[in-house]
Amino acid sequence: MAGDTGRERKNNRETGSHYERVAGAYLEQEGYEILEYNYRCKTGEIDIIAKEAGYLVFCEVKYRTSDKKGHPAEAVNPAKQRAISKSALCYMTVNGIDEIPCRFDVVSIENHKVILYRNAFDYTG
């Protein structure tokens, strides 16, 4: 963010990583197999990549400490959905995956409450 110091960016990354691990633990309890955290490619980043019930699942993790900025899942707007979709395509291409159905889930964490939205949005290229 503009105006953030290096320390603030580091703290934000650490906080984000913490909540991604919380989300990952929750997903494992729900039967997901975590394949990767923080996948990065030229088109963007995916917080968690997992397998569940025969699907390759691309998960976006959103957290809030209060509702002042709205519900966490609301932050996954159409632009974010496109970026995640492109990154998912990149992951599948790089890894030679084309025969596995995939879906996009959102994990919302607000005040320590975890909510999973399966199939939260469709691929948007």
Regions found by a protein language model. Give the residues of each.
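Conserved catalytic cores of phosphodiester-cleaving nucleases, focusing on short active-site segments
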Residues: 46-68, 84
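Surface-exposed interaction regions that form or flank ligand-binding interfaces
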Residues: 1-2, 86, 97
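Generic recognition of well-ordered alpha-helical segments
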Residues: 29, 86-87
